[in-house]
Design a protein with these regions (language model features):
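N-terminal helicase ATP-binding lobe
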Residues: 1-558
Length: 558
């Protein structure tokens, strides 16, 4: 497409010019009229008469030092005009800021913000509500729901919650009234029968959108939502590719899988150490391998670390293990983020990444990138996949460019750089392929959605299963079915039945013969708790810890 027919391509041309200028402020002053015409008002600032006039009218209600760009103003206006709105725009657009701008400007009484992760709950609270506390002082902030607590819906409330917490039957009824509902990352509403979380998010939307006087759904890279007229309140769709920063992808070919580690090391060494850099790994094991084979060989930087980090390192060495990968990373100026790291430890690392100049490199898996808006100049994609290293688990173009979009931040970087380490079997990605049409499962043909709506009688296998458990469909939805698909529940039940037989047999063996060892019983119980088959190592460790002469965790793990 020619640039004159593609405003974003023109924007990128001018952003690159600012980035390459010896004096970007002087160059912005020279280009002020062009920048203003392209809606790059954040760069034209007060360098032209039109910009000065515009900024007076576009001043943020939250922060008078910020002027909203024209498309942000449009979004706030569309939210106000429509009972329901779906907004698709790049990560750097500033969608979340628009939401809080609307809240401050129009003051809806009961606000519910639904986000994918607890990390985002914390981010919204710290970076916006706490930072601009004078603007939200009349709101009571809730980051969890308590069935025993009485909430006053006649006063001003903001609930910031994960969808897991609101979809449960009891929690859903706690929220009596919603004046303004926002659900983030709604591309995850797209039908995926293999994913239980898709069902959870769809039901959160289904229940809460009916209660809400007004709602907004947020996502990147969505071209359209199929059957949008079937959704609650027939939402208005606003799609934009506006971005005030440029995301570049640089491809670094490798010939063999084992070259990924050395290439990542080489790229990282070539980058400015003062720039924030994310290093993405598809699995926790590949991350830990990089730490043990590359980072562990780097010199320690203990004399540069503050006392809080040093205290944590000493505590972790004593209570966990001196060779824990996190300790190895911290001592050398790296942070790590994955689902195996305790939540509190993840949170304090994110704070250091955002606020400290000592920690500019963060190793992560998809647990971070799906749930936190970090600031990064660079990202190294060591392999374009998640969960697995197998070729069949490659990223889609949507996944890939959603990752790339995590680089570059307004007021910090004109250009964000993604470094793609590509083997011969890895895909080529085109940005045009990332923009997709989706259909929410709640409007699709779905057995699980029917069950959630109480339409159980349609399915004989469901009816028979409820009879076997001797429970009503209401009991099923309240206590079992709110977080899992029916097929998942059946698999869990069958595993439970099998483990129950084994457990009772082992208990009977203990009753009949007191000399029977405890290890087999520990193995069965651990399998039940962790839903894993291979548990020999863990069972031996637990059995040791349960012995009368208790050893420390560190000694037991040896």
């Amino acid at each position: 497409m020619k640039q004159q027919n593609n405003p974003q391509a023109l924007r990128e041309k001018y952003i690159r010019e600012l980035n390459g200028a010896n004096n970007s402020a002087l160059r912005a002053k020279e280009l002020a009229d062009d920048l203003f015409s392209l809606d790059l008002t954040v760069y034209s600032q007060n360098f032209s008469f039109r910009s000065i006039v515009y900024n007076l009218f576009a001043m943020s209600e939250i922060d008078e030092n910020i002027s909203m760009h024209p498309e942000q103003l449009q979004i706030v206006s569309k939210i106000n005009e429509n009972a329901a709105t779906i907004i698709s725009a790049p990560t750097s657009f500033g969608k979340t800021f628009c939401i809080f701008e609307y809240i401050v400007k129009y003051k809806p009484k009961n606000v519910v913000l639904i986000v994918p992760t607890l990390a985002l709950v914390d981010e919204y609270f710290k970076k916006i509500i706490k930072k601009y506390k004078n603007k939200f002082s009349h709101y009571k902030i809730h980051t969890s729901l308590n069935e025993e607590k009485i909430y006053d819906f006649n006063s001003f409330n903001i609930f910031i919650l994960t969808h897991d917490r609101v979809v449960q039957e009891t929690n859903y009824h706690i929220i009596e009234k919603i004046d303004f509902l926002v659900i983030d990352e709604v591309y995850k509403l797209e039908t995926d029968m293999q994913n239980d979380r898709v069902l959870v998010l769809n039901m959160a939307y289904y229940y809460l959108s009916k209660k809400a006087s007004k709602y907004v759904l947020l996502a990147p890279f969505i071209k359209e939502v199929n059957d949008i007229d079937k959704l609650e309140k027939s939402p208005f769709f606003y799609g934009s590719n506006y971005s005030p920063v440029v995301n570049d992808v640089r491809t670094f070919p490798i010939l063999q899988e084992q070259d990924r580690v050395s290439e990542c090391k080489r790229i990282l060494k070539s980058l400015n150490e003062e720039e924030k850099t994310l290093i993405y790994f598809p699995t926790v094991s590949s991350m830990y391998k990089y730490i043990s084979t590359v980072i562990a060989l780097e010199p320690k930087k203990l004399k540069f670390l503050d006392h809080e980090v040093l205290f944590f390192i000493e505590w972790a060495k004593e209570e966990i293990h001196e060779e824990w990968c996190l300790i190895t990373a911290l001592e050398r100026g790296y942070l790590i983020h994955n689902g195996q790291i305790p939540m509190g430890t993840r949170m304090f690392q994110l704070d250091y990444y955002e606020q400290s100049n000592l920690f500019n490199k963060l190793l992560c898996t998809s647990t971070l990138l799906e749930g936190v808006n970090t600031t990064a100049k660079n990202i190294i994609i060591t392999k374009p996949s998640r969960i697995s290293n197998s070729p069949g688990d490659h990223f889609s173009a949507f996944d890939f460019f959603n990752l790339v979009g995590r680089t570059g931040r307004l007021h910090q970087h004109y250009i964000g750089d993604a470094y793609y380490i590509k083997s011969p079997s890895d895909p080529e990605y085109r940005k045009a392929d990332a923009v997709k049409s989706i259909r929410f499962e709640v409007t699709d043909a779905s057995k699980d959605i029917d069950i959630q709506k109480g339409e159980v009688e349609k399915y004989q296998d469901v009816v028979e299963f409820l009879k076997k458990l001797n429970i009503t469909k209401e009991d099923y939805l309240a206590n079992i079915g709110s977080k899992a698909r029916f097929d998942t529940v059946i698999d869990l039940y069958n595993a439970y039945a099998m483990n129950k037989i084994k457990l009772l047999a082992q208990l009977q063996a203990h009753i009949e013969d007191g000399r029977v060892g405890r290890l087999r019983l520990v193995e069965i119980l651990y399998k039940i708790c962790e839903q894993k088959e291979k548990v020999k190592l863990e069972s031996n460790l637990i059995n040791t810890l349960l012995s009368k002469k208790k050893a420390s965790y560190k000694k037991s793990s040896r």
